[in-house]
Amino acid sequence: FGLANLARRRSLSLIQATSLALSFTALMLLAIVGPGLLDTWRRELPPDTPNHFLINLQPEQAAAVATRLDALGARQLNTLPLAVGKLLAINGKTPRAEDFSDRRAAGWINGETRLSWSEALPPANRLVEGHWFGAAAATPEASVDRLWVDMFHLKLGDTLTLGVGEQRIEARITSVREVDWSSFRVNFFLLLDPASARSLPHSVLASFHLPRGHAADLAALSRDYPNLSLIDVDAILDRVRDARR
């Protein structure tokens, strides 16, 4: 249950890295300075801050799982599709790690790119340049996090070519976002317009807030959907705090 389950599924651990790594890095940094600051930080978070994540949810399961979570009293349920692909070109040119001073660029260029799509601007995202996706974009559009803009020297109007499974998509950057990675919501560096992306092979990531006392209910959910991996943030924080006392 939780991180132990993820550890047994290396591929799932890799899949969830983009959405959760920055949040959990922040947690670990807080843990280093001691449980007092950690407890203070927890009290300052909004009461309905997401404290659970579901990983590897299949599209055909999403509605039924959401209904069960709603029956348990889950709040702030946020789901986004997750596709795994590769960044093939920027403005028609194959990117090379040595062309960028930011060392993190190599990971994106040589590894996988995890992306999503959404009709509306997701929670914990703020539009800082450009416009959000139209109802029916004539050509594929992309929205990138500011980190990508800085790392790859991107600007509005640039094109990104992506390979996802057997599909290839070339999207024009129409907006730049600033993401609150400490929000404990499902977030992505790269979002595509839904009309262009919804046919891509994908799973679903979900975040939600559920009060304590539902461990048995969540265990039952995991048994009924054995492909799911559940991360209980409260349990992780408790263990971090206890380990530091």
Description of each model-found segment:
Residues 1-245:
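Alpha-helical transmembrane segments of bacterial inner-membrane membrane proteins
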